[in-house]
């Protein structure tokens, strides 16, 4: 008997820029200042694995630890059971970390209970905050509401199969970022995750009981419904539903579990709380779930959500399902995180608008996602391709990268001038074409004066490319003559320093070198 509790905190925070670094350029510092105090929804995810007992997993809300003198049940004092549970948790941790998709970090005792100057997760939960300098707040339980300090809680629960849709899935289509030809797939519970723009906690519980005992109890319930079917047709319908559940479990080998999910939001403004209540209901409706605003069980569910206290969850607030369907109700998205790599560029999260440091070159190769650093920027006219390229190139240059650009529309002339003026002409060199001063190059100029075979072949290939059309293949005699002319010219400029290496002198010497043998041999 154990409980898997996934607790996702979504807290409104403001972006704090780092503008004190001396190496920041004018544009980088202006970028940081532009996003100063930008609000965004930060995500903190916790996963709690709790060992419980058969008796405690069946207790209801009227018999929690709040009503008893002994908090720890006697069964937990069994060292052998505790050792087996800890070993199972260790195996679970290794499996998750080895997957490469999720990283689990086990919390130390000081991170749970807190220490001087730093709050633990229990203290953060009681204050509905994730800051390290939280202050404890009074918790008020009133007939009409529950308060934590100045914040008023609003709770929506998924605790009955009648509130769930007819079918669930691992993912769903997100219309805002999807097109006619491509789908943006998010998890089934994404509407109550990062897409719900308010302070809230999304609790997801899976109660793993004795699978065989659960099916045995369902068999007994089905027989009872069968015997009472003559008194009510509803009993016959329920019996058929139970039989279908049992058939699925036996034929497909599915694990019977109990599940519960709730969204706990809060605000210190009653008018804003009304808006939040409507937003939560709308997001649940997007999941095709029936919004159930729970005003009675808020204190009990808040108490059961304390890290490590999941065993006090009231059994009447859970429903039976299978393990796969229960996992579909888990939130699987988070907001983007900054890369740990020192090399990267600043990008902005399209959902929250928060700047992030992203490495799109080295980190994907280290993780095996890509095998090269090529980038293909695709978009219609006016979509910001050149704007993004300017942004990327500038930051790469500021981090020491060597950049060579071929600019066909003067899109990067301004950036080059900025770098040129800032470096006093050392960088930001921009070659452009004009009728008076066209772009030219000299393949015959070599600083050390050494021409190897590769250099000679590249010069010959260049001249053939300029000479012949794409669909016109050179003759063998032309290739031999050109190769001899290039070799003779290179030998000439090596022996005679008065000859300036360029196309003009090559043409003049080629006329002499090629025309004379041609006349003697009558080659056409």
Give residue ranges: language-model regions:
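Glycine-rich phosphate-binding loop of nucleotide-binding enzymes
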Residues: 1, 342-432
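Extended, folded cores of ATP/NTP-driven motor/assembly subunits in large transport
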Residues: 1-333
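Switch/coupling segment of Walker-type NTPase motor domains
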Residues: 4-17, 35-36, 391-495
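Hydrophobic alpha-helical scaffolding
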Residues: 75-78, 82, 232-235, 266, ...
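Short, well-ordered alpha-helical packing segments
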Residues: 86-93, 97, 264, 277-281, ...
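A glycine-rich phosphate-binding loop feature that marks nucleotide/adenosyl-phosphate handling sites
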Residues: 108-116, 296-304, 413-415, 477-486, ...
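Long, K/E/R/D-enriched contiguous segments that form extended
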Residues: 490-511
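Single conserved hydrophobic/aromatic residue that forms the stacking wall/gate
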Residues: 512-524
